[in-house]
Design a protein with these regions (language model features):
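Conserved N-terminal glycine-rich FAD pyrophosphate-binding loop of Rossmann-like flavoproteins
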Residues: 108-131
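Glycine-rich loop(s) and the adjacent beta-strand/alpha-helix scaffold that form part
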Residues: 261-264, 269-323
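A short, basic/flexible loop-to-alpha-helix module at the beginning of a structural domain
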Residues: 55-76
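N-terminal Rossmann-like FAD-binding beta1-loop-alpha1 element of flavoenzymes
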Residues: 77-104
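Conserved redox-cofactor binding core of oxidoreductases
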Residues: 161-264, 285-286
Length: 323
């Protein structure tokens, strides 16, 4: 440690190698060296706030207290979209199409993996194939029953009532130039699980209507990235959520984000709102064990992104959301 400190001070910067003393070093060592150099000069050191991810007794943890001196950038926009996954990319594409002022931040270096299949109710694709309209009240009841009555029916109704319009938006991009992709619709008996697999009597089994573009050359999220870039927007990669900010009345006014490249903090003021599209918490064992114990005790196979650590959920709860 003393030798590293001497090298840092002698070089006058963090551009050193702890072994050879040369000015070439790995990204990981460089990151640590920058912190050491800042400490050696008596500067405030910016440290990551996204870890740890809670513990075995407290999945939520404590909201980070970020020193104002550590916030070295400020961005102003109308809308902040957090997360370049399936929800965030679709929202960003819609915002770009409508010329909205927004910033899209993503903690990783690329858009997240596309979930190719999504459910729709009475979409234009279903209408083209002559599929009868769905009994929406019955579907809402079935989904609520399968969730043990613990779901928020307002969220389910939003999907039931707006998924067709969402599909029209998606298809308007994917099925036109320069992509011209073909939509695949699975519905009716083809989408129904075999009767002998059912544990309880159920008239409806979802997906009722399933849409996908899995045969497309490019994943949907990559297409959306190209689309928003064609409209003059960009994605702020390597920029993760640190915390939500709110005013004295409790209104969310923006976020504090953190660069995953060098750990500096950025205040992003959002005049009209923040959209959290951060994914779930399947990659956070503490949240899984405490919030979904059955998910960890009886599941024998799973598929999830390691990046889904529930940080957006935790940040929302810290800001006052109910879970």
């Amino acid at each position: 440690a003393d030798e590293l400190r001497k090298q840092l001070m002698a070089a006058g910067s963090a551009e050193i190698d702890g072994v050879s003393g040369s000015t070439i070093t790995s990204e990981a060592v460089m990151k640590a060296a920058k912190s050491c150099y800042a400490q050696a000069k008596g500067e405030a050191v910016v440290s990551s706030v996204q870890l740890p991810t809670g513990d075995e007794n407290d999945w939520l943890g404590t909201e980070p207290d970020i020193d104002e001196a550590a916030i070295t950038e400020t961005w102003d926009t109308d809308i902040v979209i957090v997360g370049a996954g399936n929800g965030g990319m679709c929202a960003a594409a819609y915002a770009a199409q409508n010329g909205l002022d927004f910033r899209l931040i993503e903690q990783n270096s690329s858009v997240m993996e596309t979930r190719h299949w999504y459910g729709t109710i009475d979409s234009s694709e279903a209408q083209k194939k002559g599929i009868a309209p769905v009994d929406r009240a019955e579907l809402l009841s079935e989904i609520s029953r399968s969730m043990g009555g613990r779901c928020d029916q307002r969220v389910v109704k939003t999907w039931i009532n707006e998924s067709a319009a969402m599909h029209d938006f998606v298809s308007g991009i994917l099925e036109n130039e320069p992509y011209n992709y073909v939509c695949n619709l699975t519905a009716g008996d083809e989408a129904k699980w075999p009767d002998d697999t059912q544990v309880s009597q159920s008239k409806l089994m979802f997906p009722v209507q399933q849409v996908d573009y899995s045969s497309a050359e490019k994943p949907r999220n990559v297409v959306f990235q190209e689309y928003i870039e064609s409209k003059g927007y960009s994605i702020d990669f390597n920029t993760g959520l640190a915390k939500l900010e709110k005013d004295a009345d409790g209104r969310i006014t923006g976020v504090i984000a953190q660069s995953t490249a060098d750990d500096h903090f950025i205040r992003i003021n959002a005049a009209k709102g923040v959209l959290l599209a951060c994914g779930g918490y399947a990659g956070n064992p503490y949240m899984m064990e405490q919030l979904d114990p059955l998910g960890t005790s009886v599941t024998t196979a799973c598929s999830y992104s390691p990046a889904t650590k529930g940080y957006g959920i935790r940040a929302a709860v810290w800001a006052g959301a109910n879970l």
